[in-house]
Amino acid sequence: MLLRDGAPDFAAGRAYYAMFYAAEAALANTELQFRKHSGVHAAFGEHLAKPGLLDAKFHRWLLDAFDKRILGDYSYEMDVNDAAAREMIGQAREFVSAVDTYLKSH
């Protein structure tokens, strides 16, 4: 809806948050606590991507999506175009699906 309404920067931000909250859910049983997004990013890489529990591409996507969210939310110029937002939305769907599958099996 945001993308259709001409707000690719905000659409990209919401795609990031879908990945971020899925990452938090995947890390819920680690008993780790996080104060910053960077803590979730690092723990996702260390505890899920590095040991191969989830594909390492998801860690990269999470980091890239965070950077684009920062640009989209805090930049004065529109830095995230429609194509980039569509790609992030597709990645977010795949990311959330992979985490859902992981959670069902762990």
What kind of feature is each model-predicted range?
Residues M1-H106:
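Terminal alpha-helical segments
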